[in-house]
A protein has these predicted regions:
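Hydrophobic positions on the alpha1 helix immediately C-terminal to the Walker A/P-loop
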Residues: 12, 16
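The conserved Walker
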Residues: 5
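Post-Walker A helix-loop "phosphate-sensing" segment adjacent to the P-loop in P-loop NTPases
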Residues: 17-30, 40
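Conserved lysine of the Walker
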Residues: 9
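Short basic/glycine-enriched coil/helix segment immediately N-terminal to the Walker B
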Residues: 25, 50-59
Length: 152
């Protein structure tokens, strides 16, 4: 799921997660920055495989906010490994404020970016959440400001 900030990516992903829970699926919600921190800490403590196994028990993982921070090589490799283990086996929702063509800005390496995009998009539904920020629109409305005059 890609799109500008405030277009409903997280809201939609959480809604899908709730629906999956209601149908008996095991769901985990996390942010990409938090996931990367956890992976790096597990790796430094020689407990990476134990941490990775934790993800295998979830039918759906929602990984929110890809694109707000860049990764060093270790983080990119660790994230690639976790996502690769799930590819074509279990469901994963990734939300990002960047389109795929800009993901090399996050990962800093064209080869790993290409591999991650390839694995994530295989048999995937791609959703582009176009539009303006719902949060900004609501804030302006609450302040009595016309959204159209601010964004022009």
């Amino acid at each position: 799921m890609t799109g500008n900030p405030g277009t409903g990516k997280t809201h939609t992903a959480i809604g899908l997660g709730i629906k999956a829970c209601e149908q008996g699926y095991r769901v985990l919600y996390t942010t990409i920055p938090y996931l990367v921190i956890e992976l790096k800490e597990s790796n430094s403590k020689q407990k990476l495989r134990t941490y990775q196994k934790r993800f295998e028990k979830y039918d759906l993982i929602i990984a929110d906010e890809l694109g707000y921070i860049s990764f060093d090589r270790e983080a990119a490799d660790l994230l690639f490994t976790v996502l690769s283990l799930r590819a074509s086996q279990k469901s994963t929702i990734i939300t990002s404020n960047l389109t795929f063509v800009r993901w090399d800005e996050i990962f800093g390496d064209a080869a790993i970016t290409s591999a991650i995009v390839d694995r994530l998009t295989y048999k995937a539904y791609l959703i582009d959440m176009e539009g303006d920020s719902y949060r900004l629109r609501e804030t302006l409305r609450n302040n009595g400001t016309d959204f159209e005059t601010v964004v022009k």
